[in-house]
From Swiss-Prot:
Membership in a protein family: Belongs to the THOC2 family.
Lineage: Eukaryota, Metazoa, Chordata, Craniata, Vertebrata
Positions of the UniProt region annotated as Charged domain: 1175-1597
Coiled-coil regions, chain positions: 293-339, 896-965, 1464-1491
A biological-process GO annotation: RNA splicing
Record's keyword annotation contains Disulfide bond: no
Record localization: Nucleus; Nucleus speckle; Cytoplasm
The protein's name: THO complex subunit 2
Chain intervals for the UniProt region annotation (Anchor domain): 1-163
Length: 1600
């Protein structure tokens, strides 16, 4: 009562006299209107009286006031005294419990005040005797209690005395005879009841005993239950309702002995009486045993025992003896199982279920723990039988398979039994509820299991095809929810308890495959993680399954796959989740189990395969597992093992892929790319598409062919029979619309790996994740392109502008996805046009192909415009951009070699089949047919590709004129081409790398206007440091392949003059004059000749060496790794020059030593490359054989060295005359400013070794002299240069020789300035800043300009220069004499053109030396000091004027003769001096023990032809010694007599060299060279240092 809502507010009590009393009376009046005792108003009235009385007890209200108001209320109800007595009774108990004297006193006063309202009799009945005594209503409570006991005993326990001996025999005999007669006639229960009444009255029978006899007869005659029920109903109307229940309870008590067994007839009678409501279940339930708390204890004990068994099974057993002990314990436990004690509640429950009284049975089961009742087999079978009966009509209608008859189940005759289900809607009434109580114990009735599954399958078919109204849909949704619940709670747990029933598993899959994978996986998750903990039996089953799985897995090997597989299959039919969870845990630990496990899974059911897919996903999504190893640089081995297992198992078995694919997509949405490894493996195994960077060139070549060639020769492993598995993968992607989303997510995640996912991760891991993401995208896109039909592909992939602008897909990925669509589109259009005109000529076919291309690609050309800013399209056209990105290697070339190779393999295979005598004839025939069919397919595919390539080339030939617009310079065009086309695509895939190189070659071969091949190659090779440093590991590999293909082309041109002349000689791509206009010209003089091209190639090789050494010296992990990968890829074509190879070899050897302990992966890479490099050493050649170095005109070479576009005019190419020294100064500027200029690698070599201090002094003296000479010359020629006007050629007018802008006074107008800036060779930002500073310094010191050919004639200029030349020569002679010891002055290994050291001021010259000389080398330090004098003189003689005046041939010859005569005289004088010094040194050496000076050793080696390998090797390409000086001197001496132009000069020179290289023996050559050295005058002084130390391939064709 105290917990009820407050009826009397406290405010009423406070204001009792004013308003509270009236409010209370009003409330009581309202509550008294309903006189019923069952209504809520009655309870509220009691509550009001209670609260009023309680306020009196608390002292809030006086008892007089309460008694007065109670007196007024007594008029409202007649039962007021009884209600008030009940209130007093409750308050009496409460005040007794409180033990507070004040409240007890208040209570006593209140009751005394109300004695006139409640009679004494009522109070004595309700109140406690002690309270009555305190009120004075009784004298002593003790006496009152004794009297009460006596009266109760007399009333309730004193029995009436009957004469049993006389009356019982006859009376009860007649009663039994009456009840046992034949009841089939017209006898009714009313008639029998009247007879029973007569017997009771006649024989004075006890009515209770009569009732007991009736029940006994009812037990014996259960078939007449209708008769006895009506009889008992009539009989009980004369008795108290509880009598029948007490008698039944007494009967049940009788059997509650230790070994007693209650008869089933008694259970049935009780069940029937309950069903007809003759007794109440609650009244009978208390008479039954065991008690509920005992049942609960038993349930807990069973769970504890099950857990104990689990602990025993999971214990580690170390010996076989312990195993035997465990088996003995199991046997003992089985023997200990005794007959369970009689459970009357379960017996009654079974009887209720048998007669169909579901409501009472449900009430009993609700009193027990979950599934406790159903865990008893009899109960479970009774529920199953009831369900059989209930679902029979529905099952007959929808569940019986076609052709099956089945055995019908008869319905219960009991009208009170549950109604049978006629429709799916009827299942909700009782059937689903019954299943919920049955739980996992449906396992006792497999037939019912199958029936339910079939009904569920029929419902799902109807549900999926239902197009009814909304109301019906809502109903079916509810039924579906119930069906899923039943599956979760009943079907799957029951399957776990069945003993390896494969049929039930397959039957269940029939229903499961109609569920979406989301529903299935939720059910599997519940089954695996929740179900096994809900029941003791399932706990035991789980433990036993794990124990058995351990036993099998310990013994699983490749040899016993079949028997072990059968055991695994048997175990998996019932408990797949537990089994697979354990197997996957073992695979994650031991990857060598993958293959045996995959092979052993062939005995699984379809349901088991689906469960396996779920278990794999759950294992992948395990949040407790780290996806990285402890070093945080590599992906965990467990993930790699799972990925490998996934690929193998999904390929081999028909497993649904939707869940796995969606999981990967979800991970990508969440920004996690680790699990792409799974997708990569699945696509590789199922579709046979392999992505690897270790592909051989043969495989790459095969990948450029058709699909058949790719499958046969493009992959490492011949993955056959992928048709079915790839079809399954395709169906899964299309059915769930995951094809495009996965592509887009992967394309976007590439950047996400770097900017979102890679924040705290190691750079190595980020690179691996990026590569994994990218490789999977390429692999997945390739799968879609080769497997999806044209319609499917086009329908799913949007246009290129939508992909890039709306989906934010990177351009390379967007074109990668769109490329197959364009090919499909063009092919289909072409086929349509061909069909329209059959039998047309080849020309018409090409025309139709071009038309179809235009129709398909025109919208693409418009779409790509939006991808870049409008300025981009000034350099390249959208058509060219789209053409580049839409074509593939398949379109450009036919891999005839690969086709031939694969066809030959098949022929060999067929021959082997013929030779095999053991093979059965039938198999032989099949294999031969297969090989023949493959051969025919390959040949047909090759023919088809040939036709296709021809059509594509025709199309490109027509398009090429519109590709590159002449709106801007070629330099900018090449920049955009590389930036937007080549570089993004060459690192996209290995085949794309090859494509990019071949495309550049194709554009060159097509003679595309405005395309400079030379500039393109130069930009690619000049500085690869930044590109290499920014690559991931796989990108570096692809970039290396790209460079390899580019080098292959360059090497082919370099190695043979005829090839070069044929493929490059008259091509616009090799023009050295780059004009701003679109005119490419056909002037032969504009072309780069063969020898100069070889110089350029050497420059490129040097640049590659320099970049490689720089990367190797950084110490950065990615720099070193990437450059080693690139070097490994380009090893077939680089290095070719011996000194460059040696520089690389030393640096790589150093890496091997440094990284052996620190970074083993780099050590392994370096060791691998080092070994390969050593094996290639025999193919390397000296530098002088790589490119021919002679005093031929160098204008074209210098122009290329300084970058195409900043070279001289054509007329300067053939000139052999020299300009004044300002030309040398400006050439130095151009070399320093150009993009192709050599960057510093190291500054260490600028210091001079201590051992050569005397040389250093002489060098410094020489430097001072040179510096003074510089200043004088600068002053004398400043005026002369200012007066000269710009040169005649366009480039000379726009640019100086250094490729930079002229000073303001030399620029005619702003237009020329604008043109000049466009034609400038592109540089990096750092180089620009550096060159600007140098330009300012030089302009202040020299203010040199290009001489104008028109202002003065060459003769006049020569006369002006003659005095200054003589002064220069005199100074050189003095400085030469200062050099003691007869040291020879080899030229330093710089790649720059020969700059006279004397022309450079001392600080600047020192700075340049520091930049060039990167490593301190004894041999090199001497060359640096002595080369100043030689370079000064040689530069005065041999420097070429870039803009010569138009002199006549006779004048040129005269000038040449004068120069050469003077130089001969000076050289002869020096040679005599040198010979004298040499003899003195030999004499000194023989007489003393002094060391041979290193320069003398060097000279001797040169004289003996061993200059290529010196004792002190340079440590970088910058220090490479000047190779084979003898050839230079020979050529110089021979060239002194020549009086021809540059072309004849070159050809004669080449003839001399080639004849010398081929015919003369080494010994003869050495003698001749020594003689020529003695005879030559000024040989040393006339030595030239070319801008490139380049290899000439024509000299060593035979060696390669």
């Amino acid at each position: 009562m105290a917990a009820a809502a407050v009826v009397v507010p406290a405010e009423w009590i406070k204001n009792w006299e004013k308003s509270g009393r009236g409010e209370f009376l009003h409330l009581c009046r309202i509550l008294s209107e309903n006189k019923s005792h069952d209504s809520s108003t009655y309870r509220d009235f009691q509550q009001a009286l209670y609260e009023l009385s309680y306020h009196v007890i608390k002292g809030n209200l006086k008892h007089e006031q309460a008694s007065n108001v109670l007196n007024d209320i007594s008029e409202f109800r007649e039962d007021m005294p009884s209600i008030l007595a009940d209130v007093f009774c409750i308050l009496d108990i409460e005040t007794n419990c409180l033990e507070e004297k004040s409240k007890r006193d208040y209570f006593t006063q209140l009751v005394l005040a109300c004695l006139y309202l409640v009679s004494d009799t009522v109070l004595k009945e309700r109140l406690d005797p002690e309270t009555l005594e305190s009120l004075g209503l009784i004298k002593q409570s003790q006496q009152f209690n004794q009297k009460s006991v006596k009266i109760k005993t007399k009333l309730f326990y004193k029995q009436q005395k009957f004469n049993l001996l006389r009356e019982e025999n006859e009376g009860y005999a007649k009663l039994i005879a009456e009840l046992g007669q034949d009841l089939s006639g017209s006898i009714t229960s009313d008639l029998i009841l009247e007879n029973i009444k007569s017997l009771i009255g006649c024989f004075n029978l006890d009515p209770n005993r009569v009732l007991d006899v009736i029940l006994e007869v009812f037990e014996c005659r259960p078939e007449h239950d209708d008769f006895f029920i009506s009889l008992l109903e009539s009989y009980m109307s004369m008795c108290e309702p509880q009598t029948l229940c007490h008698i039944l309870g007494f009967k049940f008590k009788f059997y509650q002995e230790p070994n007693g067994e209650t008869p089933s007839s008694l259970y049935r009678v009780a069940a029937v009486l309950l069903q007809f409501n003759l007794i109440d279940l609650d009244d009978l339930y208390v008479h039954l045993l065991p008690a509920d708390n005992c049942i609960m204890d038993e349930h807990k004990r069973e769970i504890a025992e099950a857990k104990q068994i689990v602990r025993k099974l999971t214990m580690v057993v170390l010996s076989s003896e312990k195993m035997d002990d465990r088996e003995k314990e199991k046997e003992k436990e089985e023997e200990k199982v005794e007959k369970p004690p009689d459970n009357q509640k379960l017996g009654l429950l079974e009887a209720l279920l048998k007669i169909g009284d579901w409501q009472h049975a449900q009430n009993i089961m609700d009193q027990m723990p979950p599934y406790y009742a159903a865990s008893h087999k009899l109960i479970a079978l009774a529920i199953c039988k009831l369900i059989h009966i209930t679902i029979e009509p529905l099952y007959r209608r929808v569940g019986v398979p076609k052709g099956a008859k089945g055995s019908p189940v008869n319905a219960l005759q009991n009208k009170r039994a549950p109604k049978q289900a006629e429709s799916f809607e009827d299942l909700r009434r009782d059937v689903f509820n019954m299943f919920c109580y049955l739980g996992p114990h449906l396992s006792h009735d497999p037939i019912l299991f199958a029936k339910v599954v079939r009904i569920g399958k029929s419902f799902m078919k109807e549900f999926q095809s239902d197009g009814s109204k909304q109301e019906d849909k809502e109903k079916t949704e509810v039924i579906l929810s119930c069906l899923l619940s039943i599956t979760d709670q009943v079907l799957l747990p029951s399957l776990s308890l069945m003993d390896c029933n494969a049929c039930m598993s397959e039957e269940l899959w029939g229903m499961f495959k109609t569920f979406p994978y989301q529903h299935r996986y939720r059910l599997y998750g519940q089954w695996k993680n929740e179900t096994y903990n809900s029941h003791p039996l399932l706990v035991k089953v789980k433990a036993q399954t794990i124990d058995r799985a351990k036993y099998i897995m310990k013994r699983l090997t490749k040899e016993n796959v079949k028997p072990s597989g059968r055991q695994i299959g048997k175990l998996s039919h019932s408990n797949p989740t537990i089994l697979f969870d354990y197997i996957l845990s073992q695979i994650q630990k031991y990857d060598n189990l993958i293959i045996p496990v995959v092979d052993s899974l062939k005995y699984l059911t379809s349901l088991n395969y689906d469960v396996l897919a779920y278990c794999i996903i759950e294992a992948l999504a395990n949040p407790e597992k780290e996806r990285m190893k402890h070093d945080d640089t590599t992906i965990s081995s467990w993930l790699q093992s799972l990925a490998s297992f996934c690929g193998a198992v999904f390929r081999k078995y028909p497993i649904d892929l939707a869940g796995l694919l969606q999981y990967v997509a979800n991970q990508l949405k969440a920004g996690k790319s680790f699990d792409l490894l799974i997708l990569k493996e699945v696509v590789q195994k199922m579709a046979g598409i392999e992505i690897t960077e270790e592909m051989t060139m043969e495989q790459l070549e095969a990948m450029t062919g058709g699909e058949q060639l790719k499958a046969e020769g493009g992959y490492f492993g011949q993955i056959r029979n992928t048709k079915k598995s790839s079809q399954r993968l395709k169906d899964a992607l299309l059915d769930h619309d995951l094809a495009l989303p996965l592509c887009l997510l992967m394309a976007q995640q590439r950047n996400g790996v770097i900017f979102q996912e890679g924040g705290e991760k190691h750079l190595k891991l980020v690179g691996k994740l990026y590569d994994q993401c990218h490789d999977t995208l390429v692999q997945f896109g390739g799968f879609l392109a080769s497997n999806l039909s044209t319609e499917d592909y086009i329908k799913r992939v949007p246009s290129i502008d939508v992909l890039c602008n709306e989906f934010h897909t990177p351009h390379d990925a967007a074109f990668f996805l769109s490329r197959p669509m364009y090919a499909h589109h063009i092919s289909s259009k072409y086929d349509e046009l061909k069909k329209s005109e059959k039998g047309s000529k080849q020309q018409h076919k090409v025309h139709k192909y071009i038309t179809s291309c235009e129709m398909v690609m025109a919208p693409v050309h418009e779409a790509v415009v939006s991808l870049h800013v409008s300025k981009v399209w000034d350099d390249i056209s959208p058509q060219f951009y789209a053409t580049f990105w839409s074509l593939t290697m398949y379109d450009l070339a036919v891999p005839h070699t690969s086709y031939e190779r694969e066809v030959n393999k098949l022929k060999v295979q067929m021959k082997a089949i013929d030779d095999n005598q053991e093979m059965p004839p039938n198999k032989k025939k099949k294999e031969k047919e297969r090989c023949t069919a493959l051969q025919d397919k390959l040949l047909e595919e090759e023919k088809k590709q040939m036709e296709h390539v021809q059509r594509v080339l025709q199309r490109l030939k027509l398009e090429k004129d519109n590709w590159l617009l002449a709106k801007s310079t070629k330099n900018e065009t090449i920049t955009k081409f590389l930036q937007l086309c080549i570089f993004p695509r060459c690192i996209f895939s290995a085949i794309d790398a090859v494509y990019c190189a071949r495309f550049v070659e194709l554009v060159h071969q097509q003679k595309t206007p405005n395309f400079s091949t030379l500039l393109c190659y130069d930009r690619v090779f000049s500085d690869i440091i930044y590109t290499v440093a920014s690559c991931t590991e796989n990108e570096a590999s692809r970039y290396g392949r790209f460079l390899c293909c580019m080098l292959e082309t360059v090497t082919r041109w370099h190695s043979d003059r005829a090839t070069y002349e044929k493929e490059c000689g008259n091509y616009p791509g090799f023009l050295t004059i780059l004009r701003a206009t679109g005119f490419d010209g056909g002037n032969k003089a504009d072309q780069l000749d063969y020898e100069n091209f070889r110089h350029v190639v050497h420059k490129w090789h040097y640049k590659l060496t320099k970049a490689s050494v720089h990367c190797l010296e950084t110490g950065e992990y990615t720099h070193i790794r990437n450059i080693l990968i690139v070097l490994t890829k380009i090893l077939p074509w680089y290095p070719k020059v011996l000194n460059l190879g040696q520089a690389l070899e030393r640096r790589v050897h150093k890496i091997c030593q440094e990284e052996k302990e620190k970074r083993p992966d780099l050590y392994a890479l370096a060791m691998g490359y080092s070994g390969q490099l050593k094996s290639r050493k025999s193919y390397m050649i000296p530098e002088n054989e790589f490119h021919h170095k002679d005093p031929s005109p160098r204008n074209a070479v210098a122009s290329v060295q300084n970058g195409p576009g900043c070279g001289p005019s054509p007329s300067s190419t053939g000139s052999t005359s020299k300009s004044d020294e300002s030309s040398a100064e400006e050439t130095d500027k151009s070399r320093e400013r150009s993009q192709c200029g050599v960057k510093a690698v190291n500054k260490a070599s600028s210091t001079t070794p201590k051992g050569n201090s005397s040389n250093g002094n002489s060098g410094s003296n020489s430097n001072k002299a040179v510096k003074e000479n510089d200043k004088e010359k600068g002053k004398e020629k400043e005026k002369e240069k200012k007066e000269k006007t710009p040169a005649t050629t366009p480039e000379a007018r726009i640019l100086g020789k250094d490729g930079k802008e002229k000073p303001k006074e030399e620029r005619p107008n702003k237009d020329e300035k604008a043109r000049e800036t466009k034609e400038r060779t592109p540089k990096s930002d750092k180089e620009k800043e550096k060159f600007k500073k140098e330009e300012k310094v030089k302009d202040e010191k020299f203010k040199t300009t290009v001489p104008n050919a028109e202002s003065k004639s060459s003769q006049e200029r020569e006369r002006e220069k003659e005095p200054s030349r003589e002064r220069d020569i005199a100074k050189e002679m003095k400085s030469k004499e200062n050099v003691k010891g007869g040291e020879k002055t080899p030229v330093s290994g710089s790649l720059k053109s020969p700059v006279p050291r004397s022309d450079i001021p001392e600080p600047e010259r020192e700075q340049k030396r520091r930049k060039i000389d990167t490593h301190p080398s004894p041999s090199h330090s001497s060359t640096v000091k002595d080369s100043l004098i030689e370079l000064k003189e040689s530069s005065a003689k041999l420097y070429i004027n870039h803009t010569p005046p138009p002199l006549s041939k006779s004048k040129e010859r005269e000038m040449d003769k004068k120069d050469l005569d003077k130089s001969r005289e000076r050289s002869r004088e020096r040679e005599k001096k040198d010979e004298k010094d040499r003899k003195e040194r030999k004499r000194d050496h023989s007489n003393s023990d002094r060391e041979v000076p290193p320069d003398l050793t060097k000279r001797r080696k040169e004289e003996n032809g061993t200059m290529g390998v010196s004792k002190h090797k340079s440590e970088s390409p910058c220090e490479s010694p000047y190779p084979n000086e003898k050839d230079k001197e020979k050529n110089k001496s021979k060239s002194s007599g020549k009086e021809k132009g540059s072309d004849s000069f070159k050809s004669e020179k080449m003839d001399k060299i080639s004849s010398g290289g081929k015919k003369e023996s080494r010994h003869d050559k050495e003698k001749i060279e020594k003689k020529e050295k003695r005879d030559s005058s000024g040989g040393k002084e006339e030595k030239k240092q070319y801008p490139f130390h380049l290899d000439v391939f024509s000299q060593y064709n035979g060696k390669l």
